[in-house]
């Protein structure tokens, strides 16, 4: 099956890359603090 390798790609993507991306966006959001 072609979809048998999908969890081995999707789990690191959601578990590692998405938190790092969200933390980077949050860091840039805090640095460019133009709300206050």
From Swiss-Prot:
Keywords, alphabetical: Chloroplast, Membrane, Photosynthesis, Photosystem I, Plastid, Thylakoid, Transmembrane, Transmembrane helix
Membrane topology term: Single-pass membrane protein
Protein family membership: Belongs to the PsaI family.
PANTHER family per UniProt: PHOTOSYSTEM I REACTION CENTER SUBUNIT VIII (PTHR35775:SF2), PTHR35775
Cell compartment(s), UniProt: Plastid, Chloroplast thylakoid membrane
UniProt cross-references to SUPFAM superfamilies, sorted A to Z: Subunit VIII of photosystem I reaction centre, PsaI
Record-linked InterPro entries: PSI_PsaI, PSI_PsaI_sf
CC per GO annotation: chloroplast thylakoid membrane; photosystem I
Protein name: Photosystem I reaction center subunit VIII
GO terms classed as biological process: photosynthesis
Known function: May help in the organization of the PsaL subunit.
HAMAP family: PSI_PsaI (MF_00431)
Organism this protein belongs to: Thalassiosira pseudonana (Marine diatom)
Parts of the chain that traverse the membrane: 9-29
């Amino acid at each position: 099956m072609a979809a048998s390798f999908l969890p081995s790609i999707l789990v690191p993507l959601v578990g590692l890359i998405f938190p790092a991306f969200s933390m980077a966006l949050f860091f840039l959001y805090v640095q460019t603090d133009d709300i206050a």
